[in-house]
Amino acid sequence: ELADKIAAADGYVMVSPEYNHSMSPALAHLLNHFGSSLFSYKPSAIVTYSAGQWGGVRAAVGMRSFLSELGCLPVSAMIHIPKAHEVLAEDGHFLEPVDAEKWTSYFARTFTQLTWWASAAQNQRNAIDPHKLAPAFKKDPRKEIPPQETPNNSSLSFRTQ
């Protein structure tokens, strides 16, 4: 059932706390479990938060490369929420005296990019099935081995002193 929901989506909002300078292990496990076949050729937005002053920015850096490897390309604008416990209530509403208008404007840049890219990617997927263009993309990338070149020992030179 979850796989069907993931496959049906045109884009994703990936939300993670910063956990030891990385994304949540639960999110990483979920992404690894379903792999690139469900997330590929669809955009994502990265939202991170932390109790500290950096808002999960270190987790976001790792998430960007992780999502890119899945073919789930993140939009350039990211959302970082420092001291999340002072900004958001458990139900997701803004706490007082937080300036909700400023935060909403901050979120809008990311979500506008995600909406635009999701629409563009959906139109392109409907026009051309990307898996027909690149069937190798459905394979597990870890099983792809690059061609091995045998070095010609005679062309190697070392400086000795």
List the predicted regions and their residue ranges.
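Helix-loop-strand module that forms the ligand-binding subsite of alpha/beta enzymes
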Residues: E1-P74
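Glycine-rich phosphate/pyrophosphate-binding loop and the adjoining helix
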Residues: V75-Q161
